[in-house]
Amino acid sequence: MSLRKIIHIDMDAFYASVELREQPHLKGRPVVVAWEGARSVICAASYEARQFGLHSAMSVATVKRLCPQAVYVPPHFDLYRQVSAQIHAVFRRYTDLIEPLSLDEAYLDVTRNFKNIPYAGEVAKEIRAAIFAETGLTASAGIAPNKFLAKIASDWRKPNGQFVLPPHKVMAFLETLPLGKIPGAGKVTLKKMQSLGMRTAGDLRRFERGELLNHFGRYGYRLYDLARGTDEHPVKAERERLQISTEITLPEDLPLGQAAGHLPHLAEDLWRQITRKNVEAQSVTLKLKTYDFRIITRTLTYSSVLPDCAALLQAAQMLMARVPPQTEDAFRLIGIGVGRLVPKNQQQDLWA
C-alpha cells in the first residue's frame, strides 16, 4: 500500500453556496442554480433543496414538480472562477502538487508539504479553516493513501467535515463499502454487479481479474484494483492548457438526450472564458465519458473563428448529433472545448 498522503478537497454545494453568500436573505430556502425555463437543467442545489430530492442535472420541469417553492438563481460562472482562484491560492501555501478536477474540487499530494506538517489530517484541517476564513464557504476533505480512496473519504463526513483513512484500515473499510460509492459505478454497472451477487467492494474483491474483464470489459481492470484499494495514479499538477474547455460530471449516468440538456449552460460558461482571455477559436470539441469510462470525442474545425456563443452552441449540438444514440450507453460526463486559439482580431471576423 502506498505511503503517499493524498487529500481530496470538495467544496460543499459550491455554486449554490456562493449564491447564498452573495444573497444571504435566501439562506434556509431551497435554492437551485439554473436558468428558469422548461428545457433547462439545474447546475446545483442547496442542501435545503436536496431535502426535496433535487440535484444537479435535474430538469427544471422535474424541480417544479418536486419542489414548487424552489428559488431559482441564475449561474454566475465568472464569480465561481474568482472564488475558485481564492481557494487554489490556499492550496498553494501547502503544496504545488495540485490536480484540479473542477472549480470546486481538487486532489492535493501533501506527502512533502511546504509547512512540514507530518499529519495530512492536520493539513486538511488548516486548509478547510483557511478557505472558510477567506471565502465564507465550507469544504469537506478525504485523506487517504491514494486518489481513489481520498475521493470516497471526502464524501464520508459531508458537509463541512473530513475523514482520514489510514493504510492499515483500508481493507476493513472496503469490505463493507457499498458499490454505489465507487467512482464511475453508475446505474448500468451497478445493475450488472447486483445481478452477480455483489453488494460491497468486499464482494467485488472475491472475483478474479479475468472474471471482471469478462463482465465489465476493460473497466474490469480498474474494478479489480479499486476493490483492493489500489490506485497508483499520481496527482498531476495543473499545466498550461493548449485549449479552453469546460465540463460537468453528472451526479448520475444519463442517456444522450438528457446529457445534451447541459450544452447551453456549458456553452455560456465556455464563451465567457474565451471572452475573458481575449482569444478566438476555430475548432470545437465535444467530450463525453460513458458509464464504463470510455471517452468519446467529436471535433469540428472551421476556416474562420467562431463569432459568438450561439455559433459555439450550434457547433456543439452538431457534434452531439454525430454521436450514435446507443441505448445501452449512459453518460457520466459531458464537456465542450475550443482549440486553434488566436489572439482576438488576428483572424477575419467571418463565419464559415
Swiss-Prot record:
Residues 6-186 form the UmuC domain. It is found in: Cytoplasm. Mg(2+) binds at residues 10, 104. It holds the Pfam family IMS_C. The record marks 15 as: Substrate discrimination. Its EC number is 2.7.7.7. The active site is at 105. Gene3D superfamilies: 3.30.70.270, 3.40.1170.60, 5' to 3' exonuclease, C-terminal subdomain, DNA polymerase, Y-family, little finger domain. GO terms for biological process: DNA-templated DNA replication; error-prone translesion synthesis; SOS response. Keywords: Cytoplasm, DNA damage, DNA repair, DNA replication, DNA-binding, DNA-directed DNA polymerase, Magnesium, Metal-binding, Mutator protein, Nucleotidyltransferase, Transferase. It catalyses: DNA(n) + a 2'-deoxyribonucleoside 5'-triphosphate = DNA(n+1) + diphosphate. Binds 2 magnesium ions per subunit. SUPFAM superfamilies: DNA/RNA polymerases, Lesion bypass DNA polymerase (Y-family), little finger domain. PROSITE patterns: UMUC. Poorly processive, error-prone DNA polymerase involved in untargeted mutagenesis. Copies undamaged DNA at stalled replication forks, which arise in vivo from mismatched or misaligned primer ends. These misaligned primers can be extended by PolIV. Exhibits no 3'-5' exonuclease (proofreading) activity. May be involved in translesional synthesis, in conjunction with the beta clamp from PolIII. NCBIfam families: PRK02406.1. Belongs to the DNA polymerase type-Y family. This is DNA polymerase IV. It comes from Neisseria gonorrhoeae (strain ATCC 700825 / FA 1090). The lineage of its organism: Bacteria, Pseudomonadati, Pseudomonadota, Betaproteobacteria, Neisseriales.
